[in-house]
Amino acid sequence: MVTISGPDGYIYDPDGVSGDKIDYILELRASGNDIVAPYAEKYPNSTFVAGRRPWEVKVDIALPCATQNELNGEDACNLIKNSVLCIGEISNMGCTPEAIDAFIENKLMYAPGKAVNAGGVATSGLEMSQNAMHMSWSAQEVDDKLHQIMYGIHEQCVKYGTEPDGYINYVKGANIAGFMKVAHAMMAQGIV
């Protein structure tokens, strides 16, 4: 991770943001002073860019994590121009429709929030299952089950999203997989 954004702009740290640096960012956020500028003062090899968004930085992977529509069409063009390889939508609807269209048109690996965020929903489901069965799984058991669920989601996206040229349209795959799951459940219940 080389960038972190806030309402005041973003920081770029070519040395990477990990360990003590993440702890410092968490301290900044916990203080109620939700800004990132002090990071550049504490870590002088980093740069603070006021009033801008991190999508102009050359990166291999972009992860919109904060709010809906935080990555727009112009941001997508910057990422594409800078040869981004993969975009993973961590926040719900982190990318605008224009950004998504640009990623798909350029055949980039774009993982939509409905597939990426499924891990959180799945973990909640696993927790409810444990509670209902009055059981307690180890962290490793939960992690193994979560990996299995996420692998299955990926396989469904590949199954339904692979285009004739081999490009995997994860949006299409996730949408069709979601539809198929609901349709099969309705048929199993005799609704359709």
Task: Identify the residue ranges that each predicted region occupies.
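Adenosine-phosphate binding glycine-rich loop
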Residues: 78-192
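Beta-loop-alpha module in the N-terminal Rossmann-like domain of NAD(P)-dependent dehydrogenases
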Residues: 66-74, 94-97
